[in-house]
């Protein structure tokens, strides 16, 4: 929602069943709100959700073990130690985005639709996570929707953070991850 800075107030919009309501709200803490600040019950932060991490692992497993043949998700689940039920929730999303294709029956399963070097971690994370911008006022197309933008001292920080994150994950492909023979898939 907003970057909260101690001692300030912000104009917030509450959205509910009765519509929108503008309120002035005190902001007592400093914390960034966005995709990388998802608090777990244990109090630890999380940058990428399980959906994002598992989507990468599924595609990486198919890249390493499939080639042209179809791989049953049961095998991927066993190798990756991921619940088959959870994988079955992710594969339709991967299929509808054109990342994988499937075949039914004997010899069926899933396989990649492109070569491993054609999949970047950024596009996989975008598919699995949705909007990857670190704050709600910044959008993936670079536009900003915040009345404070003209005088916001923190906006350039979030813009640079988003750019660095996008460039970093865009520079890593599934093929790159396959190159480390020391680590098991």
What do these predicted ranges mean?
Residues 90-95:
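Basic amphipathic alpha-helical segments that dock to polyanions
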Residues 55-67:
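Short amphipathic alpha-helical interface segments
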Residues 99-106, 111:
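Beta-hairpin "wing" of winged helix-turn-helix
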């Amino acid at each position: 929602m907003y970057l909260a800075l101690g001692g300030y107030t912000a104009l917030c919009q509450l959205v509910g069943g009765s519509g929108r309501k503008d309120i002035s709200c005190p902001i007592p803490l400093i914390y960034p709100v966005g995709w990388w600040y998802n608090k777990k019950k244990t109090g630890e932060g999380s940058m990428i959700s399980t959906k994002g991490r598992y989507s990468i692992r599924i595609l990486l497993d198919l890249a390493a073990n499939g080639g042209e043949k179809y791989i049953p998700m049961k095998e991927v689940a066993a190798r990756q130690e991921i619940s088959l039920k959870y994988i079955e929730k992710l594969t339709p999303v991967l299929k509808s985005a054109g990342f994988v294709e499937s075949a039914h029956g004997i010899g069926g399963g899933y396989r990649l639709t492109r070569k491993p070097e054609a999949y970047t971690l950024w596009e996989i994370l975008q598919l699995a996570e949705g909007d990857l911008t670190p704050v709600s006022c910044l959008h993936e197309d670079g536009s900003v929707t915040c009345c404070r933008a003209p005088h916001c001292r923190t906006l350039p920080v979030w813009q640079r953070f988003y750019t660095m994150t996008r460039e970093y994950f865009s520079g890593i492909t599934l093929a790159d991850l396959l190159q480390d023979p020391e680590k098991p898939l």
